[in-house]
């Protein structure tokens, strides 16, 4: 048994939204907290992944799916006698690509926490906009060592990668050339 065709089609509209909402939340509210910024971003990536898995699972259970894909569009911009439409379309190929894009986005978000040295001290000679150069720490014996330092623009990275994830997911579910490039 699978979910209704209409439910899954409506769900496709919501798959790209969590990352763009995460972008807005990080930029406007959580950018001072590194933990909150990556938590918001990873949670958004997880929600998109969950939606994509529901769509993918339902897509592979539909007989003759290529003949009746999940599709929906709305009138967006009037152009005289016609309308430019925006919409979503999930056929067998886009269901597969959606599966891989959502999975890859989630893995990149998770990997990025460690890659940016989360949990390490802030560098004592790092500058915003430049890569981290390390922090000087003193051990129990009084010896000074340079260790990896956390990325100075950590929250900004998660905001921008969330915006990128929104773009990738929108590209996969778009039903026409206009929304493919928007």
Where would I find each of the regions flagged by the language model?
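Generic alpha-helical secondary structure signal
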Residues: 16, 20, 158-165
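Functional transmembrane alpha-helices
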Residues: 19, 91, 161, 171-172, ...
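Beta-sheet entry/capping signal
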Residues: 13, 96, 169, 178-180
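N-terminal signal-anchor/start-transfer transmembrane helix
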Residues: 16-31
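Alpha-helical transmembrane segments of multipass membrane proteins
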Residues: 24-28, 166-173
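Transmembrane-helix bundle of Major Facilitator Superfamily
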Residues: 153-157, 167, 175
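Transmembrane helix-loop-helix hairpins at membrane boundaries of multipass inner-membrane proteins
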Residues: 2-11, 29-159
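Hydrophobic residues within alpha-helical transmembrane segments
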Residues: 17, 43-46, 163, 182
């Amino acid at each position: 048994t699978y979910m209704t065709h209409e439910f899954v089609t409506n769900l496709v509209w919501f798959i790209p939204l969590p990352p763009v909402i995460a972008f807005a939340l990080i930029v406007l509210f959580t950018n001072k907290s590194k933990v909150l910024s990556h938590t918001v971003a990873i949670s958004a990536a997880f929600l998109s992944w969950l939606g994509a898995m529901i769509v993918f699972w339902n897509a592979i259970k539909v007989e003759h799916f290529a003949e009746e894909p999940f599709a929906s569009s709305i009138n967006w911009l009037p152009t005289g006698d016609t309308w430019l439409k925006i919409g979503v379309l999930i056929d067998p190929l886009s269901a597969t690509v959606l599966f891989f894009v959502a999975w890859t986005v989630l893995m990149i978000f998770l990997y990025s926490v460690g890659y940016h040295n989360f949990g390490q001290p802030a560098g004592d000679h790092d500058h915003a906009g430049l890569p981290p150069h390390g922090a000087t720490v003193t051990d129990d014996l009084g010896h000074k060592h340079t260790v990896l330092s956390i990325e100075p623009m950590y929250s900004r990275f998660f905001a921008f990668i969330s915006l990128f994830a929104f773009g990738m997911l929108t590209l996969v579910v778009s039903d026409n050339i206009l929304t493919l490039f928007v």
